[in-house]
Amino acid sequence: MKVGDEGAGDGGDEPQLVEELRVQEPSSPPVVAYRAARRFFTDPRTVGVAQAGPRTAAFMARTWARSREPVADPHAVPARPSLGLAVQVLLDELLISTMKNPRLLPRRADYERAGVEVAQAFELYRERGWLEDPESYHRTPGAPAVWSTRGERALGQPYEHLSFQSDYEPHRGEPGRERWLEMDANRTAHAWVLRQADPGRPWVVCVHGFGTGAPFLDLRAFRARRLHSELGLNVAVPVLPLHGPRQQAGVASGEGFMSIDLVDTVHALAQSAWDVRSLIAWARLIGRDAPVGIWGLSLGGYVASLVAAMEDGLACAIAGIPATDILDLYHRHSPPAVRKRALEHGALGPEATAVQNVVSPLVLRPKLSRERRFVFAGLGDRMSTSGQAHRLWEHWERPSVAWYPGGHVGFWWVGSVNRFVTEALVSCGLSAGPSGASPAPSLSSSET
């Protein structure tokens, strides 16, 4: 029996119960209780939690079967079934379930608007040559002319809260332009900064994932204290559009960044790249052209990969557990009925894919050399998926990579990931390694 199926039950008595409830007052306790229970058991989040265990079991069964097959691709790193992998996969599945808010499911008008705007964007991008040359869609920002900083603390960690005006605007004539510019809070860029006494020390720009944008989460996710105190780096963590203080009051962090409205996602990613590049220009300005590397996690891995295809002179680019294809994620994580209607209205399909390509790190070519590109990902990632990371790794000409036997959110507890990132920063000249320690050991078994 599926959770929430109407008419399902051991005795088949629910239709009679429903009929009895209909004749009662709408506000009577039995009716209220029944409706509340029905909402709970049909809520996609409840259904998702109930299905997390079976989904994990199915994944582990597939993993076991694949582990017994001959490995045809010498570059493939098959996952090995283990209790630790199962726990991390289950954690991913549970987290995915909590993100399936029924309030965010598209309505008929949303499908229609999204389909019309995709068609308009496709025609505009084709006419202006952006489909043939996606790089020409993007403009180059400068350092902010005016900025402000104030000292703050998060979980005992002092940092500077940097803010400046984001000068990004969608191109004139782009669908969704006016809607995007109406989001006032989003027009101020923010970043959490840990500066060395010498601003000329190298910088690492760390781009957070979807739904965060709070200093206590972002600084912890990147182990910013270690980057700053042990590796001797200046650290800047930009807040992505529609996240944290850039979101409208009363709206969850990240809401609207990835939705049925693909043109909003295009604007969000284009602005992400613009603002991160403005932050890099600022770091170079105050750091007297100090070297700058970029490291992103999840959605931040997507943005870091995008910036690596636009920004000259980066010391390194590290894509961690990266998302690389938004439409593929939409296909994967949306209910079948939503996917079907989106395809029917043109919100998904060939034109949508062409529109997405102007902000795709799988289409744009990275500007930095292969030895300065790095990828790490979990073989059991149920959110961004290891497949998306593998596509980026291939597009980046198979640079140094670390595959770990875990899920999306479990990277933080994997020691080999921490060593891999340290080695990347050391090998590119951003750091001499942890204070008083020799450089991190090579992960040659993970390199190709």
Stretch-by-stretch model annotation:
Residues M1-G176, P439-T448:
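N-terminal targeting or regulatory segments adjacent to alpha/beta-hydrolase or S9 domains
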Residues R201-G209:
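Short beta-strand element of the alpha/beta-hydrolase
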Residues H208-A270:
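Cap/lid segment of the alpha/beta-hydrolase catalytic domain
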Residues G287-L297:
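Alpha/beta-hydrolase fold nucleophile elbow
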Residues G296-G300, A304:
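Gly/Ala-rich beta-loop-alpha elbow adjacent to hydrolase catalytic centers
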Residues S305-E351, W403:
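Hydrolase active-site cap/lid region
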Residues L329-Q388, E394:
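The feature captures the conserved acid-bearing segment of alpha/beta-hydrolase catalytic domains
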Residues G407-N418:
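Catalytic histidine-centered segment of alpha/beta-hydrolase-like enzymes
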